[in-house]
Amino acid sequence: MWEPQGSLDPVLESIENELRDQVAEARSRWAGFDARLAIVQVGGREDSNVYIRMKLRAAENIGITAEHIQLPRDITETELLANITSLNESPYVHGIIVQMPLDSVHPIDSHAITDAVSPDKDVDGLNTINEGRVRVGDLSGFIPCTPAGCVELIKRTGVTIAGKNVVVLGRSRIVGTPVSELLKWEHATVTVCHSKTKNLSEITKTADILVVAIGRGEMVRGSWIKPGAVVIDCGINPISDPTKKSGQRLVGDVAYEEAVQVASHVTPVPGGVGPMTVAMLMRNTVQAARRQLDRLLAPTWPLRPLRITPLSPPPSDIVIARSQKPKDISELAHEIGLFSNEVSQYGRTKAKISLSVLDRMRNQQGAKYIVVAGITPTPLGEGKSTTLLGLVQALSAHRGRNSFAVMRQPSQGPTFGVKGGAAGGGYSQVIPMEEFNLHLTGDIHAGTAANNLLAAQMDARIFHELTQKDGPLFDRLVPKIKGVRKFSPIQLRRLKRLGITKTDPDTLTEGEKSKFARLNIDTSKIMWNRVVDLNDRYLRKITVGQSPTEKGFTRETAFDISVASEIMAILALGRDVEDIKERLANMVVALDKSGNPVTADDLGMTGALLVLLRDAFEPTLMQSLEGTPVLVHTGPFANIRHGCSSILADKIAMKLAGENGYVATEAGFGSDIGMEKFFDIKCRASGDTPHCAVIVSTVRALKMHGGGPPVSAGMPLNDVYVQENLELLSKGLCNLGKHISNGNKFGVPVVVAINKHGNDTPAELNLVKEFAVKNGAFRAVLCDHWAKGGLGALELADAVIEACDSKSKFDFLYPLQLSIQEKIQIIAKEMYGAGQVEYTDEVLEKIKTFTDMGYDKFPICMAKTSNSLTGDPAVKGAPTGFTLKINGIFASVGAGFVVPMVGEISKMPGLPTRPSIYDIDLNTKTGEIEGLF
C-alpha cells in the first residue's frame, strides 16, 4: 500500500518480492528456467547509460538475466533490424527493449525499430500491435511500462478507480495516450488535455486522479489540484539550481512542494514514476518468460487439426492427398512449440528442424515411445505406415494427445520400381505425398554424394600410391605453404593412431614418412561401394579404372542403392553431431595388405563428409492428412541395415510432445527383422525405452501363411483371399502368434492392429482378434483408418494409451558381452524359431578376425529375407527347429554392428518388367505429377 504522502519504497519492494517469488516458482517447475532480457543500445549517451544501469540492477535483484547489447554509433538501420530479428528468433531471449533515443550517425526510424520487436517480446509495450491492443481493451499483450506503472501506483493508494474523474495532461504515444486508455478500461471517466487545451487549470481541478506527462517543468501548480486528489507526475525536467554542484536539478511537471499541500498522494521526481517504470519492465519480462514456460509445459499443443470428409469407397491415394490443403508448415511448427530460428522452411509444406531444440528442451521429460512393426508380410505390404499415421491422427486430432509420427524417408528406387510410395495410404497418409516420396529435402542425395566422394578418394589414393615413390607422395600429402609444412588436424589423428608422436613434418624419419603416407589398401579387400538412389540391376557388378589415364589399374566393384550405405545407418544412429562425426571417422572402407582396417579418417575424409551431410543431420517436419506433425529422417534399408528412422528425430519428437505425449515410429518388415533391430540396435544406441509395440496384421497375409497361393504385386488376388475361408486363416494364425511372442520377449506390451480390408468377413476378423488376445497380446483391435482416417483408429489409440500406462519391463534380447555366434544363436532361436545355426568356413574365419579386432562387442544386424521367418522366402507360417545358414558376414564399424548374411541379399534392386515409371508423367499445364501412385 502507498500511504498518503508516504514513501514509494515499500511499493517498489513489494513488487520486487512478488517478481522474485514468481521467478522462484517458475524454477521449481522447470530447472532450467531463466528469464532473459535484452537491452539494446545504439551509441553511448550517458543519460541512456544511467537508465540502463538501473534496469540491470533491478533485473539482478529479481533474478532476471539482463544482457546489455551496446551497438556502435555507425550502425545502420538495416544492421540494427538484423540484430533485433536475431533476438526475436532466439528462444533464450524473452524480453527485448531498445533504449531510446538512438545515438547513431545514420538516420534510423525509431518507430520502425520499436515495431520490429516481436509483440511477444516487446516488454516495453511500444510495438504498434501491443499499443493497439491497449486501445481496444485487449490487455493480454504487454502494456507500456510507464502507463502500467501509473495505474499500478494509483491502485496501490487504495483508491477505487472505477467511477472517478481522471484528467490526463499529455497525449504522447508513450505515456499520455496509453494511460488514458488504461484508465478508461478501469471504468474511470477520462479527460485528455494537452498544451492547446483552454481553461486547463479549471479542468485539472475537477480530477480525482491527475496524471501529468506534458514535459514542462513544474507547470502544474498546487492551485490546479483538487484537494485529496491522487497526482501521478511522469515528467522529468532539468532546471537551473546554483546550489547544486552540477548547477541544475531534476523536477517533474508538477510543483511538488505545492502539490503535497493539497493532494493525498503525489509521486516524487526523481524516485517516483521512473523506478515504477523499471519495475513494470521487470514484470513484463517475467511475464514473457512465464508465458513461454507455460506453453512449454502445457499438457497439449494448441493444435488445429485439418478436417477430412472420407468418401466411400475411398478414391486413389493421390486423389485423397490432393483433396486436402496442407496448413503452412510454419503454422504447424508454431503449434507444436518450435521457434522460428529452429525451423528452416523448404517451401510451405516441409521444413528442417534444428538440433538446437534438444539443447533448449534438455530438461523436458520425454513422451511415450511406440514402435509399429508387423507380421511376416505379403509382397503387397500389410499397412504399417498407414497404421502408424492412422494411430497418430487418432491420438492428436481425435483424442487431444500430443503425438508424432516419425518415419523413414523412402528411397526413389522402390518408388519408380514396383512398390510405389511409402507415405501411408487412404485417409491416413503424409502430405504432400509427392514431395515425401521424391527428393524431399535432399538428405538421401547428400548421403549419396558423401558415400561416393569417399569411394572416389579411396580409388584416387590407391592410384597415387601405385604411381608415386614415398618421398613425392609424402610431399604432396603435406605440401609446403609459404615455405612451411604443417599437418592438418585429421593427419595428426592418423599419426597418433600410428603411434607417431611427432607433430613437425620435417622431423619424421623416412620410415615414418612412408608409414604415414602409404595406406597400402588391399584391393581384394575393399568393402566400400558407390551408391545411387535408383533400382539398377546392371550396377550390381562393374569394373572401374578402364580409362587409359588410370594406367591399367582396374578392379571389380559394384553400386549399392543409396539407402544401403553405411552412412545412412550412421545418420540414423547418431545421438548428436559429435557422435555422427566419430562414427563417420571409424567407417572401415578396406583392409590394408597386413589385414589392418583402413578408415574414412585415414583417407582424410571425416570433415568433408560432415560438410556434405550438414543439412542431413536435421529431420524434416511434414504433416499427416489431418494436420498432425510428422518427422521424416533417414532411410536405412531394413534388410542389410537396421531399417529405422533416426534417433535424433525420435528424441526431438519426444521432447516436443512432452511427458504426456506419444511418439510412434515404424520398424521395417516384421518383428523378426525390424522390431528386433529397433530394440537391440536403435534403442541400445539411443538409451530410450519403448513403452509399447504395435503388430500390424491382415487376414490376407495370415491366409497366405496358412497355405494360400502366392501373393504377387501387380497380379490379381486368388479367390481364397477375397472369400471367407476360416480354415485357411486358422492355419496361418501361428505366424501372428510368433510375432506377438517376439514382442513379449522384450518385455513390452503388444497391441495387435488388425487392418480391415473390404473382403474380410466379421467371422474372420473376430477369429484373428480372439486368437491374438489368447496368445499374449495386450489388446487386439480392428482398424479402419485407411477408409476413415483417425476416426478409424480410435480403438487402436485407446489401446496404445492403455498399454503405455501399463508397466513396461523392457530388456534387450541379449547382452553385448556375448560372442558373435552366441548373439546370432539367440536371435535365430528366439526371433525366428530356428533349431540351430550353421556357418561357412569363410564366415567362421571372419568372425575370428572381427573378434580379434574387438567387433564382437557390437550388436547384431541380421540380413535375412523379410518374406519368411526362415532364410527361405518360400517358407510361410511359423516353422520351428529348422537350420539357419549364415553364408556371409561383414562389420559396419562406424554404424556399430555386425551383419550376418542369410541367403542372397541384394543391395541393389532391379526394375521389374513393367515398373511404375510407365504410369508417371508431369502435367505441363498444372505442374502436377500424375500416375506416381
Curated annotation (Swiss-Prot):
The keyword Oxidoreductase applies. GO terms for biological process: L-histidine biosynthetic process; methionine biosynthetic process; purine nucleotide biosynthetic process; tetrahydrofolate interconversion. Residues 1-303 are annotated as: Methylenetetrahydrofolate dehydrogenase and cyclohydrolase. ATP binds at T378, P379, L380, G381, E382, G383, K384, S385. Residues 304-933 are annotated as: Formyltetrahydrofolate synthetase. It catalyses: (6R)-5,10-methylene-5,6,7,8-tetrahydrofolate + NADP(+) = (6R)-5,10-methenyltetrahydrofolate + NADPH; (6R)-5,10-methenyltetrahydrofolate + H2O = (6R)-10-formyltetrahydrofolate + H(+); (6S)-5,6,7,8-tetrahydrofolate + formate + ATP = (6R)-10-formyltetrahydrofolate + ADP + phosphate. CDD domains: FTHFS, NAD_bind_m-THF_DH_Cyclohyd. NADP(+) binds at G170, R171, S172, S195. Substrate binds at Y51, I52, R53, M54, K55, V98, Q99, M100, P270, G271, G272, V273, G274. Pathway: One-carbon metabolism; tetrahydrofolate interconversion. One of its GO terms (cellular component) is cytosol. It is found in: Cytoplasm. SUPFAM superfamilies: Aminoacid dehydrogenase-like, N-terminal domain (SSF53223), NAD(P)-binding Rossmann-fold domains (SSF51735), P-loop containing nucleoside triphosphate hydrolases (SSF52540). Keywords: Amino-acid biosynthesis, ATP-binding, Cytoplasm, Histidine biosynthesis, Hydrolase, Ligase, Methionine biosynthesis, Multifunctional enzyme, NADP, Nucleotide-binding, One-carbon metabolism, Oxidoreductase, Purine biosynthesis. Its EC number is 1.5.1.5, 3.5.4.9, 6.3.4.3. GO terms for molecular function: ATP binding; formate-tetrahydrofolate ligase activity; methenyltetrahydrofolate cyclohydrolase activity; methylenetetrahydrofolate dehydrogenase (NADP+) activity. It comes from the Eukaryota. PROSITE patterns: FTHFS_1, FTHFS_2, THF_DHG_CYH_1, THF_DHG_CYH_2. HAMAP family: FTHFS, THF_DHG_CYH. In the N-terminal section; belongs to the tetrahydrofolate dehydrogenase/cyclohydrolase family. In the C-terminal section; belongs to the formate--tetrahydrofolate ligase family. Homodimer. This trifunctional enzyme consists of two major domains: an N-terminal part containing the methylene-THF dehydrogenase and cyclohydrolase activities and a larger C-terminal part containing formyl-THF synthetase activity. This is C-1-tetrahydrofolate synthase, cytoplasmic. It comes from Spodoptera frugiperda. The lineage of its organism: Eukaryota, Metazoa, Ecdysozoa, Arthropoda, Hexapoda.
